């Protein structure tokens, strides 16, 4: 059986005694499920970031520029980065991936969960949907090596009648995930 990207990332974090992990998109927003991401690495020292201040936010920053301006304070500072449902909201995800790669220690691992097929939603904008190959390419261009990628949450698109046959032949998934390593 294939290990999921999330399970792969959890294994990467479990071999470290007290990993430092950056949680991206930490601010709870109205209507969110508020999942406890810390359960994936309970022995870790978690640092949180978001583009807006909030009760769960340690660092207010934009992942496209965040850690480049702070005199290198966070360069190679994290053993892991956990980035759930954030990348689709970033105008330049390739810049954010490069920035996240700079934040990882050598040997550090990144987990991203974003959407392949999903309704439009804000906070504050909704820019992209991704395929598995797109995430792999973005990570590669940022200097990261893919350990595992995949889709989850099979779904259906209800197309107009003239496109009905297309939906039968094409797979759709709510989520696409990746675990990559520096």
How would you describe each model-predicted region?
Residues 159-182:
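Core SAM-dependent methyltransferase catalytic element
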Residues 40, 72-75, 127, 168-172:
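A generic structural micro-feature
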Residues 1-16:
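Class I SAM-dependent methyltransferase Rossmann-like catalytic core
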Residues 124-126, 131, 172-176:
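Residues that flank catalytic or metal-binding motifs in active/ligand-binding sites
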Residues 121-125, 166-167:
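Active-site rim elements
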Residues 25, 156-159:
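Core dinuclear metal-dependent hydrolase active-site scaffold
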Residues 127-143, 148-150:
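Short alpha-helix
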Residues 19-121, 132-136, 178-180:
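Conserved SAM-binding loop
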